[in-house]
């Protein structure tokens, strides 16, 4: 018997909630690590998120609370269990497939307009739902949108609510107050201009971030990517300056006018104003029909897999590879470019 096998067999099993066996690490979230798990009773695969119970700023139980609030919404994973296991806070949820960042790379960093528009419709819907529940996400990026698996493989899910914040009291309907002394929360590449300026985030900022995600998929790269600087703070300032100095029409050049209309609309929203989600969805739905596309859930990666005779990508393997790639960098910062 080789040494590796002896090590594997001697390693104590981790059982979460008395029902789920931890198999292996498959990724990292904004806080903590994500593991592939399995139901001891049914053999069904699940995702298990774990963070140290001694973390300076524990987030997992807060995130579990948010998932409970969002339960029943289309495109949000179900929570199976959350609690404490020895030295860890744990959260057991539906296992999902690859992220849009994974799939963008799988498609050699090019999405057709049809794929972008099918995703846009679902992404706007996910944001509308969390806003309806009085929360803003504050970290909208391709890594936090995942496709489902099995019968949900064509459905888009929104995850990672560690940075989410309640923007309105659900009972009194009072909105949080306007402030201008906030640190940048989220990922600098997709952050709104107001977030860069230290203004308290609200619904408009999630929507603007989504606009940058759309243009990332349309262009393959955003003008403020790869900025060189001596410190992180200088880098964020350069990203902010480039973002503010790039006219929307320049950013959206080569894309249908609806994308610049979307971003101009989002940037014009007032702090407490509710976005007109239906107007925005209709903007892109009409474009979709004008281009004579069918909403058949055949994405670019669906076509690519058919051409290469591959089955559905194993979510655990894809996420594990993504995590290895990230570990090659010097750790994942909370705020990346």
Curated annotation (Swiss-Prot):
Predominant location: cytoplasm
Q: Which InterPro entries match?
A: CK1_Ser-Thr_kinase, Kinase-like_dom_sf, Prot_kinase_dom, Protein_kinase_ATP_BS, Ser/Thr_kinase_AS
Q: What is this protein called?
A: Casein kinase I isoform alpha
Q: Which cofactor does it need?
A: Mg(2+)
Q: Gene encoding this polypeptide?
A: CkIalpha
Q: Where is the Protein kinase domain?
A: 20-288
- List the catalysed reactions: L-seryl-[protein] + ATP = O-phospho-L-seryl-[protein] + ADP + H(+); L-threonyl-[protein] + ATP = O-phospho-L-threonyl-[protein] + ADP + H(+)
Cellular component, GO, one term: cytosol
Single GO MF descriptor: protein serine kinase activity
* Active site location: 139
Quaternary context: Interacts with cos.
Q: Name one Pfam family in it.
A: Pkinase
Q: GO biological process: any one?
A: negative regulation of canonical Wnt signaling pathway
Outline what the protein does. Answer: Casein kinases are operationally defined by their preferential utilization of acidic proteins such as caseins as substrates. Can phosphorylate a large number of proteins. Negative regulator of wg signaling. Phosphorylates arm directly or indirectly and stimulates its degradation which prevents inappropriate wg signaling. Phosphorylates smo which promotes its accumulation at the cell surface and its signaling activity in response to hh.
Summarize what activates or inhibits it: Activity increases following DNA damage.
Report the EC code(s) recorded for this entry.
2.7.11.1
Q: Which family does it belong to?
A: Belongs to the protein kinase superfamily. CK1 Ser/Thr protein kinase family. Casein kinase I subfamily.
Binding residues for ATP = 26-34, 49
Q: How is it modified after translation?
A: Phosphorylated. The dephosphorylated kinase is active in the cytoplasm while the active kinase in the nucleus is phosphorylated.
User: Keywords for this entry?
Assistant: ATP-binding, Cytoplasm, Kinase, Magnesium, Nucleotide-binding, Nucleus, Serine/threonine-protein kinase, Transferase, Wnt signaling pathway
Kind of enzyme, top EC level? transferase
Q: Where in the cell is it found?
A: Cytoplasm; Nucleus
User: What domain of life is recorded for the organism?
Assistant: Eukaryota
